Amino acid sequence: GTSVILPTIRNPVQLAKSLSSLDQLSQGRLTVGVGFGGPHMQEAVFGVTGEQRSRRFVEGLNILKALWTQPKATVSGTFWNFTNIAMEPKPVQKPYPPVWFGAREPAGLKRAVRHGDGWMGAGSSSSADFVQHVGLLRRFLDEAKRDPATFPLSKRVYIAIDNNKERAERRLRQWFGDRYKNADMAVRVSLWGSLAECLDK
């Protein structure tokens, strides 16, 4: 499935209902990934300006949580307003499915600590980047007096398992060239080779 959803460009009422339905269908196995996204597409296609993005993101996220936890929710916000909206069924997980943030900038990492339940490192970031981000997160968690043991971390990793190491590298380079327009990124952020070699790394 997708790594993160962008709450800034979604209707939060419809999104809350869709995610709650997924949690019901999966019998409580949903983890919600949210991200800030890049500004250019959001402004050009959805009319969300740079100065609105942060406020829309937080407001949308708060609406999700309100609809998941309250019998009837009322919101008087900057971007969305509604009165006594009931959403059923509620998620299986209580109070709601864990919300993990995808972020790499300090402001996004702080947002994750303030509003999230976990964090995932981007697949396009290197191991060195990941270590740096984890260090910042640990600091922000400490400043917020949050227990790091209750804030799980993860990293998406691109892997090509093939006993022919050269062929595995070619496949990754081709995929990164198509997806990111940067074939060399594959070498910086991926694992490839036999199963044993990948596990060893």
Each language-model region and where it sits:
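Active-site-adjacent structural elements that line small-molecule/cofactor binding pockets in enzymes
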Residues: G1-K201
